[in-house]
A protein has these predicted regions:
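HIT superfamily nucleotide-processing domains
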Residues: 1-113
Length: 113
């Protein structure tokens, strides 16, 4: 396994969770506080605290991660959806393990953030 932390909730979910999608190095799980009818989190197995540190992934792994985000949305039947990453406490990040929010199943307004 890639470097993980025993005290990290998301590291634990990558090892043992109710995955809606899985690929080598990445998992997707349902968000426990959904903001849309479909709201999943895409989590890399490797513990990287925030998007600021995305450079810890090499180019191939970064590409695979983005492809997995798109593949997860496809597998969930989403044609239109939102992908978000919260960076740091001021950006709304509460779990310090890089993850992508994939939200769909409803229309998002232009002025909405």
């Amino acid at each position: 396994l890639p470097p993980q932390r025993e005290d990290c909730l998301f590291c634990g979910l990558t090892r043992d969770g109710k995955w809606v999608n899985r690929a080598d190095g990445f998992v997707a799980v349902e968000d426990i506080r959904p903001l849309a009818p479909v709201h999943v989190l895409v989590i890399p197995e490797r513990h990287v605290e925030t998007f600021r540190d995305v450079g810890e992934f090499d180019a191939h792994e970064s590409k695979r991660m983005l492809e997995f985000v798109a593949d997860t949305a496809r597998k969930l039947g989403l044609d239109d959806y939102r992908v978000m990453v919260n960076v740091g406490p001021g950006g709304g990040q509460t779990i310090f393990h890089l993850h992508w929010h994939v939200l769909g199943g409803r229309r998002f307004g232009e002025a909405e953030t």
